[in-house]
């Protein structure tokens, strides 16, 4: 796509307009004018209030509660943009919630991660930009290009800011699935690495087995892709404390904070729990967490990725 003839246009759904506005502020472009209405029968309709013809359109929509509304609104925005003769449409999905559903692990279920990918492409998405998929293989469900950003740099910088001698600490992976991310952050911090071996019994219940590594007397940095109900986090912190951890910091990409998560975090024996602004955390949740929650800004990273996609530059250079 020739960026000289294709204006950069950024629009937002309703799920996380503050992030979309911050992305535009970093890009130095105005947030596009659009509105979504809901009829009395619960149907949605999207209106663009400016021309999209031949534009390089980026639509920011995170898949947070209510997830089904967020997905439907994004598909309507993509379809409306294509109908308005947009030159290219990129779906910017900071948090892709159906990434957990990546395989058929029980009879008679849908692989929802693949289904949502199919729906987005059928709606007309030419490209997808997302961050820290729970299951990276979801990337392969798309036939269109997917740029998968990592928040590792942001999380690492945050730990260094909180603890100047972070290199003396230990990065703790809550399970085997997060060891790759933890090892990358440990490399950036030049710190130690540990892992908890555990068994997941259900979506909300885990059974820890053992901590592999040494955390005794050390500052521990727990990293993961997301916090949902915080049940797994409670177990991880409990084990780390029982093994002699001194101070505990937690940082994840996506702070979903569903169900009893906020109450659990407020009671948790940690210094701080940080998450990125891929999911909008309401002020009342921040207040109820007793000052333990922090929000990290990934708008500059998304803005750089959008700028590089628009001009045809590499995106992978942003987090290597």
UniProtKB/Swiss-Prot annotation:
Q: Which InterPro entries match?
A: Pribosyltran_N, PRibTrfase_dom, PRTase-like, Rib-P_diPkinase, Rib-P_diPkinase_bac
How does the record describe its quaternary structure?
Answer: Homohexamer.
Q: Where is the active site?
A: 198
Reactions this protein catalyses: D-ribose 5-phosphate + ATP = 5-phospho-alpha-D-ribose 1-diphosphate + AMP + H(+)
Task: Say yes or no: keyword Transferase present.
Answer: yes
Record-annotated residues binding D-ribose 5-phosphate?
200, 224
Question: Pathway of this protein?
Answer: Metabolic intermediate biosynthesis; 5-phospho-alpha-D-ribose 1-diphosphate biosynthesis; 5-phospho-alpha-D-ribose 1-diphosphate from D-ribose 5-phosphate (route I): step 1/1
Task: Give the main localization category.
Answer: cytoplasm
| Residues that bind ATP | 41-43
Can you say where in the cell this protein is located?
Cytoplasm
Cofactor info, note text: Binds 2 Mg(2+) ions per subunit.
Enzyme Commission number(s)? 2.7.6.1
Q: Which gene encodes it?
A: prs
Q: What is this protein called?
A: Ribose-phosphate pyrophosphokinase
Which species is listed as the source? Deinococcus radiodurans (strain ATCC 13939 / DSM 20539 / JCM 16871 / CCUG 27074 / LMG 4051 / NBRC 15346 / NCIMB 9279 / VKM B-1422 / R1)
Q: Which CDD domains match?
A: PRTases_typeI (cd06223)
Q: Which residues bind Mg(2+) 2?
A: 175
Q: Which Gene3D superfamilies match?
A: 3.40.50.2020
Q: Where does Mg(2+) 1 bind?
A: 134
Free-text function comment from the UniProt entry: Involved in the biosynthesis of the central metabolite phospho-alpha-D-ribosyl-1-pyrophosphate (PRPP) via the transfer of pyrophosphoryl group from ATP to 1-hydroxyl of ribose-5-phosphate (Rib-5-P).
Per the UniProt entry, what is one GO biological process?
5-phosphoribose 1-diphosphate biosynthetic process
* Source taxon at top rank: Bacteria
GO CC entries = cytoplasm; ribose phosphate diphosphokinase complex
Q: Which family does it belong to?
A: Belongs to the ribose-phosphate pyrophosphokinase family. Class I subfamily.
Q: Which cofactor does it need?
A: Mg(2+)
UniProt KW keywords: ATP-binding, Cytoplasm, Kinase, Magnesium, Metal-binding, Nucleotide biosynthesis, Nucleotide-binding, Transferase
Q: Which NCBIfam families match?
A: PRK01259.1 (NF002320), ribP_PPkin (TIGR01251)
Listed GO MF terms: ATP binding; kinase activity; magnesium ion binding; ribose phosphate diphosphokinase activity
């Amino acid at each position: 796509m020739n960026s000289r003839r294709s204006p950069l246009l950024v629009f937002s759904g309703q799920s996380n307009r503050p992030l979309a506005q911050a992305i535009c502020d970093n890009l130095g472009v105005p947030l596009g004018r659009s509105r979504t209405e809901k009829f009395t029968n619960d149907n949605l309709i999207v209106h663009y209030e400016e021309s999209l013809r031949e534009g390089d359109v980026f639509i920011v929509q995170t898949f947070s509660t209510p997830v089904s509304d967020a997905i439907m609104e994004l598909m309507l925005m993509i379809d409306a943009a294509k109908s308005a003769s947009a030159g290219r449409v990129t779906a910017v999905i900071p948090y892709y919630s159906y990434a957990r559903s990546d395989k058929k692990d029980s009879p008679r279920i849908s692989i929802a991660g693949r289904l949502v990918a199919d729906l987005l492409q059928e709606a007309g998405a030419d490209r997808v930009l997302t961050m820290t998929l729970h299951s990276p293989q979801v990337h392969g469900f798309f036939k269109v290009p997917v740029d998968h950003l990592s928040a590792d740099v942001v999380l690492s910088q945050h730990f260094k800011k909180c603890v100047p001698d972070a290199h003396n600490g230990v990065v703790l992976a809550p399970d085997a699935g997060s060891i790759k991310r933890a090892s990358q952050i440990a490399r950036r911090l030049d710190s130690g690495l540990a892992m908890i071996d555990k068994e997941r019994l259900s979506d909300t219940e885990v059974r820890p087995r053992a901590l592999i590594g040494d955390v005794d007397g050390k500052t521990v940095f727990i990293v993961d892709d997301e916090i949902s109900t915080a049940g797994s986090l409670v177990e991880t912190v409990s084990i780390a404390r029982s093994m002699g951890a001194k101070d505990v910091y937690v940082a994840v990409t996506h702070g979903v904070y569903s169900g009893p998560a906020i109450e659990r975090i407020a009671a948790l024996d940690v210094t701080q729990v940080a998450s990125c602004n891929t999911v909008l955390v309401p002020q009342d949740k921040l207040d109820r967490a007793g000052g333990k929650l922090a929000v990290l800004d990934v708008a500059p990273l998304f803005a750089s990725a959008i700028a590089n996609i628009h001009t045809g530059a590499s995106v992978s250079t942003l987090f290597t």
